[in-house]
From Swiss-Prot:
It comes from the Eukaryota. The RxLR-dEER motif acts to carry the protein into the host cell cytoplasm through binding to cell surface phosphatidylinositol-3-phosphate. The gene is RXLR51. Glycans are attached at N101. It is found in: Secreted; Host nucleus. Belongs to the RxLR effector family. The lineage of its organism: Eukaryota, Sar, Stramenopiles, Oomycota, Peronosporales. The keyword Magnesium does not apply. This is Secreted RxLR effector protein 51. A motif (RxLR-dEER) lies at residues 38-53. Keywords: Glycoprotein, Host nucleus, Secreted, Signal, Virulence.
Length: 138
């Protein structure tokens, strides 16, 4: 064999070994257990499309922050419900509000359906609260 052929074969072998080593390291097989877990965690948050992002929900329902938000929402719904009961004396909405113990979202849905029976200042109050809390228009 010629020396140029030997050098060429050695060069190809070195490139192949280098490629295999790089592939093993990037797959995590050459790393320890901690490195593999870190690699898995770093790749688990990457989603290619919006559909994949929607399938994996980002909410963690067991956290303290989520529970605090739920309690605050229930408390504000109760306060809002009491304020509406004081405004609406003896009409159909007052009876509906007394029957239900709803969340803030359910309360807004109820009011959106039955807003016609309230006095004018109550309608304005509902609209301003809805716009500031939800960013929408009734």
């Amino acid at each position: 064999m010629r020396s140029s052929t030997i050098l060429f074969v050695l060069g190809v072998a070195m490139v192949a070994v280098n490629g295999v080593t790089t592939a093993l390291i990037s797959d995590g097989t050459g790393k320890g257990t901690q490195g593999k877990h870190r690699l898995l965690r770093s790749n688990s948050g990457k989603h290619k499309t919006d559909e994949e992002r929607l399938k994996l929900s980002a909410r963690i329902y067991g956290t303290k922050a989520y529970k605090k938000r739920q309690v605050r929402n229930r408390e504000s719904a109760r306060k809002f419900q009491k304020a509406l009961l004081n405004m609406a004396d003896g009409n159909d909405i007052a009876r509906l509000l007394k029957k239900r113990n709803t969340t803030l979202k359910g309360l807004f849905a109820l009011l959106a359906r039955n807003k016609a029976g309230l006095p004018k200042e109550a309608k304005n109050h509902i609209t301003t609260v809805y716009n500031t809390r939800r960013g929408g228009v009734l």
